[in-house]
């Protein structure tokens, strides 16, 4: 039988080659066991694999028999998703607002992952190129890269904000959108079951009437399918709005160039002081010319980028155009998508002022810097997009929230020790700071003011030294001296099987990403065929990897981290030796592991 992943790859190619194709009978691929082994491979390494939903179902205990039971329930259409367990997480550092997460059971995660793979094969090739959220080989950085390239020269920004986007997705609208592309009642009914599964909060069941639970495996692609309608609307609006530029010079520019040509003509016959005066006049006129707009702004253009529910438009036009576009957006979102565009947060900002997108401040530069080219000069930065770090709004709240710094009465900032991590080892303390520093610096590695993070590095480094000093009742200077490596940096030594290694304190310049602007294209089939069948092979072998018993049904024992195993039990030694988070064992061994 042909591997299902190859069939999905063929579906992907058909969708890419014929964007109007309607797909049918996709539900049957949910009944193929090989996709569930691939789904388990995709999920088991995640931190959430061991997180419980509303019951004790986790990645531990996965088996061929479990896959067979899931497939049978899907085949006879008795499969019913469990309600998700609702949990709240903080939205932002130092914010009192919280975001609800819905945590499914692991069995539901498996089915959702298989469903996600099927939907992705159909929709990924037809999603807008302006959409970057929750998509393979795309990220915040690819969205910002596209913005930097496409928004050059725009006059206005429209920052889009949909009120409670994920919580207000209309289930009927979503079902209608999917039904337009996929004519498969069983598949749409399964999606409907997940949408209507409800949630448990404080052991009370609550029905869901709208929205996709944040935390669900299939929720991101369902949100993208829904918001792809917004992408298509904006792109259609942009085509109608577009007006090509009448390429003619401004009267002011023509006047200056005419004066220069007249002076150059007079220069041919001039002598002495007259010639010197003309040369000075020409130089002054050229300086004026380089500061004068050369082309009339008669073009009309809309540029658009979306990352999940966060989107921004760049408009070449006037403010009245932006107001009209905003009204059109609001009408479409309310009438077609049944959601609401926030009037207060959907801002219209002139491009010489900063707008906010994906945690960056963006603006269009109006610098008149000149660059020599042979016998003439040209303007280089005018109209280019600048991405900046909002240091006061993003970095400082992060530092205060992590108790890295404090503000003195005179307003100055100083790094402080983080007493709540004194109990950690020196290696763990340095690793914590390194992880936080690299996370911030990697995200802002494409900012034009990236060097501002040198101050961030300084505050993090001296907070780390003060934390180590506080733990050992010493001083920062002594800790620096103790851990100095002789190469101008410092780090904590630690023992490994290969000998002593050193965890050096991270540097912000090491995070400057030089390869960011290259997109990697990965073939879908090549990325999944091969090692992805290892779980299938191990379970089908019917040989217990612990006791060696043969021809027995097996289950997967799962742990979150191999490094946390102590090596005191036989099964721990086996997992450490294999360097795996999973072990295929018989039911007797699995019972002994959990009940020694």
Where are these regions (language model features)?
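Non-catalytic terminal/accessory segments
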Residues: 1-596
């Amino acid at each position: 039988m042909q591997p299902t992943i190859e069939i999905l790859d063929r579906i992907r190619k058909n969708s890419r080659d014929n964007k109007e194709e309607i797909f049918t009978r996709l539900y049957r691929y949910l009944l193929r066991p090989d996709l569930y082994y691939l789904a388990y491979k995709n999920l088991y390494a995640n931190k959430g694999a061991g997180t419980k939903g509303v019951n004790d179902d986790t990645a531990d205990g996965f088996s061929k028999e479990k896959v067979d039971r899931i497939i049978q329930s899907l085949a006879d259409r008795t499969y019913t998703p469990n309600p998700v367990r609702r949990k709240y997480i903080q939205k932002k550092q130092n914010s009192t607002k919280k975001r609800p997460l819905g945590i499914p059971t692991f069995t539901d995660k498996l089915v959702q992952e298989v469903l996600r793979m099927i939907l992705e094969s159909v929709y990924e090739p037809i999603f807008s190129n302006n959409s970057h959220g929750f998509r393979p080989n795309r990220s915040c950085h690819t969205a910002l890269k596209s913005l930097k390239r496409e928004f050059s020269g725009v006059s206005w920004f429209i920052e889009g904000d949909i009120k409670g986007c994920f919580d207000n997705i209309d289930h009927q609208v979503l079902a209608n959108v999917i039904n337009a592309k996929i004519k498969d009642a069983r598949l749409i009914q399964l999606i409907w079951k997940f949408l209507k599964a409800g949630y448990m909060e404080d052991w009370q069941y609550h029905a869901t009437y709208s929205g996709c639970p944040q935390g669900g495996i299939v929720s991101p692609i369902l949100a993208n399918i829904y918001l792809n309608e917004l992408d298509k609307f904006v792109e259609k609006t942009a085509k109608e709005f577009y007006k090509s530029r009448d390429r003619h010079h401004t009267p002011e520019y023509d006047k200056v160039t005419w004066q220069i040509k007249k002076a150059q003509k007079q220069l041919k016959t001039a002598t002495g002081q007259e010639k010197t005066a003309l040369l000075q006049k020409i130089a002054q006129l050229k300086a004026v010319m380089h500061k004068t707009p050369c082309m009339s702004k008669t073009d009309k253009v809309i540029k658009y980028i979306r990352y999940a529910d966060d989107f921004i438009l760049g408009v070449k036009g006037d403010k009245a155009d932006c107001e009209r576009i905003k009204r059109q957006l609001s009408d479409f979102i309310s009438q077609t998508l049944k959601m609401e565009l926030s009037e207060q947060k959907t801002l219209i900002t002139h491009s010489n002022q900063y707008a906010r997108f994906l945690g960056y401040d963006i603006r269009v530069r109006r610098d008149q810097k000149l660059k020599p080219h042979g016998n003439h000069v040209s303007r280089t930065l005018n109209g280019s997009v600048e991405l900046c770090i909002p240091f006061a709004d993003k970095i400082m709240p992060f530092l205060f929230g992590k108790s890295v710094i404090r503000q003195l009465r005179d307003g100055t900032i100083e790094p402080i020790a983080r007493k709540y991590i004194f109990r950690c080892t020196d290696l763990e303390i340095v690793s914590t700071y390194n992880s936080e520093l690299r996370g911030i610096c990697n995200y802002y590695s494409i900012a034009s003011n990236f060097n501002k993070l040198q101050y961030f590095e300084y505050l993090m480094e001296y907070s780390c030294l003060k934390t180590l000093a506080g733990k050992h009742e010493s001083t920062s200077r002594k800790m620096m001296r103790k851990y100095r490596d002789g190469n101008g940096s410092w780090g904590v030594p630690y023992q490994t099987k290969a000998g002593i290694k050193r965890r050096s304190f991270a540097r912000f310049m090491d995070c400057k990403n030089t390869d960011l602007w290259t997109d990697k294209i990965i073939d879908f089939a090549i990325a999944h065929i091969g090692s992805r069948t290892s779980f299938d092979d191990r379970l089908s072998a019917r040989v217990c990897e612990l006791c060696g018993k043969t021809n027995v049904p097996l289950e997967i024992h799962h742990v979150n981290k191999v490094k946390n195993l102590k090596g005191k039990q036989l099964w721990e030694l086996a997992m450490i030796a294999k360097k795996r988070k999973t072990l295929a064992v018989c039911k007797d061994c699995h019972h002994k592991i959990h009940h020694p």
